[in-house]
Swiss-Prot record:
Manganese or magnesium. Binds 1 divalent metal ion per monomer in the absence of substrate. May bind a second metal ion after substrate binding. GO terms for biological process: DNA replication, removal of RNA primer; mismatch repair. The keyword Metal-binding applies. This is Ribonuclease HIII. GO terms for molecular function: magnesium ion binding; RNA binding; RNA-DNA hybrid ribonuclease activity. It comes from the Bacteria. The keyword Nuclease applies. InterPro entries: RNase_HII/HIII, RNase_HII/HIII_dom, RNase_HIII, RNase_HIII_N, RNaseH-like_sf, RNaseH_sf, TBP_dom_sf. Belongs to the RNase HII family. RnhC subfamily. Endonuclease that specifically degrades the RNA of RNA-DNA hybrids. Keywords: Cytoplasm, Endonuclease, Hydrolase, Magnesium, Metal-binding, Nuclease. It catalyses: Endonucleolytic cleavage to 5'-phosphomonoester. The gene is rnhC.
Length: 300
């Protein structure tokens, strides 16, 4: 998928809206003046005059619309690394125990030699020991914003009759991490999120968030394997999650496993027997099926 970003004047904006009128779509982004989708390409015209085309046919549609592609601010495929990028990723959403760590990191091309020397890669391919060694170095060198949602706070916010579900809470965390990083004066040419939902669904949930920013977003599956900025965020977030998991375990006197398998069921049942439901409210995500499985183990 390609992304084209152009700056167009009022006359061209008016002409564009007329051409794409039959293809108009809604956008929850308050900074977007006009949105359309044609031939699989999403077109976003911002109030600032910035025009963004996202999709595999971005170049072809730009030519069809007679847009000044030669004046493109940047043109990048989803695995381009030659521009300053903010990458955002989360860790912990699939684990019963522990919170959710979300990190947004800013990587400039000048950082690439440092990152490659460290062997930065998708954190899912690295051992926990390696991550714990690399993460502090990244935190010191790379501008980033880390957020950790504790299990206790997660349980207050996520579930039936509560403000968020498992998807919308991640939208809120990613949005806030990126927003806070931008507030530090960071100026990326692209912002990439490791895709955990569709762009339209992301924008739907984003509508209820207080903080917004005008920068367009690129959503890519397994983005941590394509962008160093997302890989950095993945590593820092993994380390933050592991630290939180370890601290929760120390508080309760149990070693808490990562993931949502049978090992989590077993430890959860032990915690229920020792401390009651309050221990899971403190250390785990209660809406996971592991809670009921742990309760069932107690009756055996």
């Amino acid at each position: 998928m390609n992304t084209l970003v152009l700056k167009i004047d009022a006359i061209l904006s008016k002409h564009l809206k007329k051409q794409l009128a039959p293809y108009t779509i809604s956008s929850q982004n308050t900074y977007v003046a006009f949105a359309a989708k044609k031939n699989g390409v999403t077109v976003l015209l911002y109030k600032s005059g910035k025009l963004v085309l996202q999709g595999n046919g971005a170049n072809a549609l730009a030519q069809e619309l007679n847009l000044p592609v030669a004046k493109t601010v940047f043109e990048a495929s989803n695995n381009s690394q030659d521009i300053p990028i903010i990458g955002s990723d989360e860790v912990g959403n699939g684990s019963y125990f522990g919170g959710i760590a979300v990190v947004a990191s800013f990587v400039d091309p000048k950082d690439h030699p440092f990152l490659k020397k460290l062997g930065v890669d998708d954190s899912k391919k690295l051992s926990d020991k390696t991550i714990q060694q690399i993460a502090p170095l990244l935190e010191k060198q790379i501008p980033h914003q880390s957020l950790l949602l504790s299990p206790k706070k997660y349980n207050e916010l996520v579930g039936k009759s509560k403000p968020y579900n498992a998807i919308s809470i991640k939208v809120a965390l990613h949005n806030q991490a990126i927003f806070l990083l931008l507030q530090k004066g960071i100026q990326p040419k692209q912002i990439v999120i490791d895709a955990f939902t569709s762009q339209s669904n992301y924008e739907k949930h984003l509508k209820k968030e207080k903080n917004h920013f005008p920068n367009p977003l690129t959503f890519q599956e397994k983005a941590e394997s394509h962008y160093l900025a997302v890989a950095v965020s993945s590593i820092i977030a993994r380390n933050l999650f592991l630290d939180n998991l370890d601290q929760l375990g120390q508080d309760l006197g149990y070693q808490l496993p990562s993931g949502a398998g049978s090992a989590s069921d077993k430890v959860a049942s032990q915690l229920l027997a020792a401390y009651g439901m309050s221990s899971l409210e403190y250390s785990a995500k209660l809406h996971f099926a592991n809670t009921h499985k742990a309760q069932a183990l107690l009756t055996k």
